[in-house]
């Protein structure tokens, strides 16, 4: 889809479909009022008949209005004045896209810039709008015999006042990069586990480096992981025929002496639970257990498209967790790269076992910040549901920056505590630390475990177990989160 920004009067624009917003109580914004005047009150007449109440997301298509160059006018409800928030604005945008998909026109122009969205300026409104539209175009039909019909709609133009055009252009540019990153994240998450395994992800990283010459990629194999002393990482993979991989992405958009930000992604390409086997019902969704790594891929794609002036490192800890005669057993003790020993009480708490060695590896980059992203605990879904990611960290400034980024990007997180009292739940009589802390506060104790390996830098942990994918039903699939949050965090660091 091509997105353009133009500063023209809506009533003079030649387009297949002109989109205008109408509020409840027949409220017309400046754009809708200008078109209404040009058509001799045609819009007002329709509204007086009660054909459109103006509730958020309601639509009404008008054909061949007089004195317009637009072939059609699509009216969309914007709700009550001064009550339009981010979610309602996204709902409005989705309703517009749904209608446009069913039309024959190859282009459309959206005159929505005069809508007041609470707490949002021209840049943020454009970003929300374009991101919603672009993400709404996503289709995954790679394995369908009958593909989705090609979309007739090819071009969307955002109409903006001249004073706002630069801000709208920038918002649209950022949104397209974020949406492309989300699409990559969703593609990788939606792939079946017989295709998307650690070696495959290494190949995908090299493919991304071919597309973007500013990206450097290194893939560490099992032999190298053993040389590095990553006993915890290797323990997760030893039950599978698929060898593990640590994928290293490096982008240098700033001076070489500027410390990088590091993103660490959990990449369990299929999680059976290992010897601590999961129930069979719903196990197919454990292909999404690599969505942390997929979100690092997606964030890198967005950063590479935007060519942000930052240095960024990605560490993707990729393995498959399978039961076999050679698999790790409950009760096994392993030595991590840090030298700390871990008693593995539950092989289904494997994400933290690959992440802890990756977090130790991150030390060599002397980072400004390290953020790990993982579908780590079912307890996070119990605590926060599927709307909000869990967030913990050892530096309050970093945590606040991520919370702020999530609010701006409409990809929110919520902070959970890392009090010392929770650390006691991880005590082991046989090793330095146990890999689980009992049934209480499971998300927090998982964060506490990781914190033991992140003491040499500012670190935060995002638990995306509830937000990385939609479970079951017709909308089942990866969401692309938290690419918007992470990209916004990095955009702020690039300023």
Curated annotation (Swiss-Prot):
Cofactor annotation comment: Binds 2 manganese ions per subunit.
MF terms (GO), sorted A to Z: manganese ion binding; metalloaminopeptidase activity
Binding site for Mn(2+) 2: 266, 271, 289, 350
Enzyme class: hydrolase
Annotated active site: 278, 352
Keywords: Aminopeptidase, Cytoplasm, Hydrolase, Manganese, Metal-binding, Protease
Cofactor(s) recorded in Swiss-Prot or TrEMBL: Mn(2+)
Residue ranges crossing the lipid bilayer per the database entry: none
EC assignment: 3.4.11.1, 3.4.11.10
Function field: Presumably involved in the processing and regular turnover of intracellular proteins. Catalyzes the removal of unsubstituted N-terminal amino acids from various peptides.
Name of the molecule in the record: Probable cytosol aminopeptidase
Organism name: Pseudomonas aeruginosa (strain UCBPP-PA14)
Higher taxonomy: Bacteria, Pseudomonadati, Pseudomonadota, Gammaproteobacteria, Pseudomonadales
Gene name, Swiss-Prot/TrEMBL: pepA
């Amino acid at each position: 889809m091509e997105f353009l920004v133009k500063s023209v009067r809506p009533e003079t624009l030649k387009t297949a479909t002109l989109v205008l917003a109408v509020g409840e109580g027949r409220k017309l914004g400046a754009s809708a009022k200008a078109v209404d005047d040009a058509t001799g009150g045609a819009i007002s007449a329709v509204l007086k008949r009660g054909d459109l109440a103006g509730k958020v997301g309601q639509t009404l298509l008008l054909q061949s209005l007089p004195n317009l160059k637009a072939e059609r006018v699509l009216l969309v409800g914007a709700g009550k004045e001064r009550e339009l928030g981010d979610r309602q604005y996204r709902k409005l945008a989705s309703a517009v896209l749904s209608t446009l998909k069913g039309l024959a026109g190859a282009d459309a122009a959206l005159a929505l810039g005069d809508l007041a969205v609470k707490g949002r300026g021209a840049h943020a409104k454009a970003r929300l709008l374009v991101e919603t539209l672009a993400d709404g175009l996503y289709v995954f039909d790679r394995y369908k015999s009958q593909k989705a019909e090609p979309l007739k709609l090819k071009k969307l133009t955002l109409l903006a006042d001249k004073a706002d055009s630069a801000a709208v252009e920038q918002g649209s540019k950022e949104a397209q990069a974020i949406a492309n990153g989300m699409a990559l994240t969703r593609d990788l998450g939606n792939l079946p586990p017989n295709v998307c395994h650690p070696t495959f992800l290494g190949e995908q990283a090299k493919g991304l480096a071919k597309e973007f010459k500013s990206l450097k990629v290194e893939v560490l194999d099992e032999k190298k992981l053993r040389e590095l002393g990553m006993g915890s990482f290797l323990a997760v993979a030893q039950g599978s025929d698929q060898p593990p991989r640590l994928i290293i992405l490096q982008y240098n958009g700033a001076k070489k002496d500027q410390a990088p930000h590091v993103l660490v992604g959990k990449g369990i390409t299929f999680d059976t639970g290992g010897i601590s086997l999961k129930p069979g019902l719903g196990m197919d969704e454990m292909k999404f257990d690599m969505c942390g790594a997929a979100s690092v891929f997606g964030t890198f794609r967005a950063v590479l498209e935007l060519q942000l002036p930052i240095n960024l490192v990605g560490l993707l800890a990729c393995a498959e967790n399978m039961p076999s005669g050679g698999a790790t057993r409950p009760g096994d003790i392993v030595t991590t790269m840090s030298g700390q020993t871990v008693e593995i009480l539950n092989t289904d708490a494997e994400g933290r076992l690959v992440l802890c060695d990756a977090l130790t590896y991150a030390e060599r980059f002397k980072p400004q910040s390290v953020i790990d992203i993982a579908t780590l605990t079912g307890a996070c879904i119990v605590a926060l549901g599927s709307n909000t990611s869990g967030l913990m960290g050892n530096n309050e400034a970093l945590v606040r920056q991520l919370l702020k980024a999530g609010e701006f990007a409409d990809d929110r997180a919520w902070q959970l505590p890392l009090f010392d009292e929770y650390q006691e739940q991880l005590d082991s009589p046989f090793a330095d630390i146990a890999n689980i802390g009992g049934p209480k506060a499971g998300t927090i104790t998982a964060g506490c475990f990781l914190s033991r390996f992140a003491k040499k830098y500012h670190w935060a942990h995002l638990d995306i177990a509830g937000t990385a994918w939609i479970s079951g039903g017709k909308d089942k699939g990866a969401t692309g989160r938290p690419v918007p949050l992470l990209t916004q965090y990095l955009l702020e660091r690039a300023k």
